[in-house]
Curated annotation (Swiss-Prot):
GO molecular function annotation: 2-amino-4-hydroxy-6-hydroxymethyldihydropteridine diphosphokinase activity; ATP binding; kinase activity
Species for this entry: Porphyromonas gingivalis (strain ATCC BAA-308 / W83)
Chemical reaction(s) catalysed: 6-hydroxymethyl-7,8-dihydropterin + ATP = (7,8-dihydropterin-6-yl)methyl diphosphate + AMP + H(+)
Name of the protein in question: 2-amino-4-hydroxy-6-hydroxymethyldihydropteridine pyrophosphokinase
InterPro entries reported for this sequence: Hppk (IPR000550), Hppk_sf (IPR035907)
Gene that this sequence comes from: folK
Physiological role: Catalyzes the transfer of pyrophosphate from adenosine triphosphate (ATP) to 6-hydroxymethyl-7,8-dihydropterin, an enzymatic step in folate biosynthesis pathway.
Family label: Belongs to the HPPK family.
Amino acid sequence: MAIVYLSLGSNLGDRHSLLSAALEMLQTRVGRLLTLSRFYETEPWGFESPHPFLNAVVALRSELKPQDILHITQAIERELGRTQKSNGGVYHDRPIDIDILLHSVYPKVQSPELELPHPQMWQRDFVRMPLSDVAPWLHPEAPTPNL
């Protein structure tokens, strides 16, 4: 069994309801909820928008491999109204965004569609703040996070 850390964000629609729906779907499809951060309201990162984000980080216990989790999170995003992914560093408003941050069984993943640990998680306050709620022992200077 692995511990998986996921970042969730929403800046369109009923943000609370969308994050809650995503959390329910993740618990049904990915694994058992271990802990959930509080929700943080943050400014958009990497683009300008009048719509602030609501962000959280969740830790789940899962038997799934990172690639399987990625496909599930992408399906959840589509089901909750996301129509396009960020591409080439071009970001936009979205009803839901789910990113895999860390996976305890597969701490290092490098593929065209997924990199673990998430390469930008320590540069983004909207990830760092909620991640510190659920895993305060993690530190950006650690070579491989101790999950």
